[in-house]
A protein has these predicted regions:
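A recurrent flexible, glycine/aromatic-enriched loop bordering the glycosyltransferase active site
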Residues: 138, 142-148, 153-182, 201-203, ...
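Conserved donor NDP-sugar-binding/catalytic core segment of glycosyltransferases
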Residues: 94-145
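A short, conserved alpha-helix in the catalytic core of glycosyltransferases
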Residues: 164-221
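Short aromatic/hydrophobic "clamp" motif used to bind/position activated sugar donors
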Residues: 87
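Active-site-adjacent helix/loop segment of glycosyltransferases
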Residues: 210-303
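Short beta-strand/loop segment that forms part of the nucleotide-sugar
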Residues: 35-44, 61-65
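Short, acidic, metal-binding catalytic loop of nucleotide-sugar glycosyltransferases
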Residues: 26-35
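Glycine-rich, basic loop-to-helix element that forms the pyrophosphate-binding segment
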Residues: 65-82, 92, 103
């Protein structure tokens, strides 16, 4: 780890979970790429995380936020303290192969049209399986439903080398995304309205609208636990996923396209509500309905 003029600034948004963060940092410190710094953006943890970082890892930059700003806000505040040419936003529930940074930096340095890139992301617990949150590069269908190589709906594929080609994609996963700092700032950073979920897709959309590209480099490998900070199947997770998907659609398309696609998407949301009712999944039902109410009452925010 380099203390002065690092090439890469690794920013870890964090909210509680010392054991999880400790494993992530221990893995980072084994990196064979040496020109990097680590910044932990702590979102007002209540478990003593700040004191633990100061005592156990005094060379790590600690950003002590006054409240929980979510992934988007935590990352933005961490980026403000970064010195590197490249920023890596990294989930705290990850471990990494020792050469992961080398491959990402090599990709970015050989092609300056690439604004952002992600590694191959595999499941922490089943290391031959792709992870749900990003797999080997993310894409978007015509109705703005995100999907990824290595994931079909809710099912993850086994990694058999079928997606080992470095290639252009639509979005890079916020689990581990490298972005050129200059372009991150120029694009307006993460939109903090998102709080958590899909803010990285929104960022990648804006970077591409600026004329840049997003890639996946599968030689770089990260393992992800998934849903540690915000568990699956909770009301809040459903709400943020549905709201942010609609917010992203309405914010990035032109008005005529947003109106057309948005109308179809809202119809699909109501179908999803009906399906959730049949399954008696009330967290899902209330999460979708709350997201639609938010969209209805925030037109100025969406069209800003």
């Amino acid at each position: 780890m380099t203390e002065q003029h690092p090439t890469v600034s690794i920013i870890i948004p964090h909210w509680n979970g010392i054991e999880t963060l400790s494993e992530c940092i221990d893995s980072l410190l084994k990196s064979t790429f040496e020109s990097y710094e680590v910044i932990v953006a702590d979102n007002a943890s209540s478990d003593g995380s700040q004191a633990w970082i100061k005592e156990s890892h005094p060379h790590i930059k600690l950003v002590e936020n006054d409240r929980n700003y979510g992934y988007a806000g935590g990352c933005n505040r961490g980026a403000d303290k970064a010195s590197g040419e490249f920023l890596v936003f990294l989930n705290n529930d990850t471990i990494q192969k020792s050469d992961w940074l080398h491959y990402l930096v090599e990709l970015m340095e050989k092609d300056n049209t690439i604004a952002a890139a992600q590694p191959k992301i595999l499941n922490y617990y089943q290391k031959k399986m792709f992870d749900y949150a990003g797999g080997s590069g993310g894409y978007m269908d015509m109705f703005c439903f995100p999907y990824a190589r290595g994931r079909l709906f809710l099912e993850q594929e086994e990694d058999q080398g079928q997606y080992n080609d470095a290639k252009k994609c639509f979005w890079a996963s916020g689990t581990a995304i490298m972005v050129r700092k200059e372009l991150f700032v120029e694009a307006g950073k993460f939109d903090e309205i998102f709080f958590a979920h899909m803010e990285e897709i929104d960022l990648c959309w804006r970077l591409q609208a600026m004329g840049h590209h997003v890639w996946v480099e599968p030689q770089s490998i990260v393992y992800h636990k998934n849903a540690v900070s915000l568990p699956m199947h909770t009301h809040r997770k459903y709400y943020l996923n549905h709201r942010n998907s609609l917010l992203m659609l309405l914010s990035n398309f032109s008005v005529p396209v947003a109106f057309y696609v948005g109308f179809i998407r809202i119809m699909l949301e109501f179908i999803a509500v009906g399906y959730a009712v049949i399954k008696l999944d009330w967290n899902h039902v209330t999460g979708i309905l709350r997201s639609l109410i938010w969209i209805l009452f925030h037109p100025v925010t969406i069209l800003k």
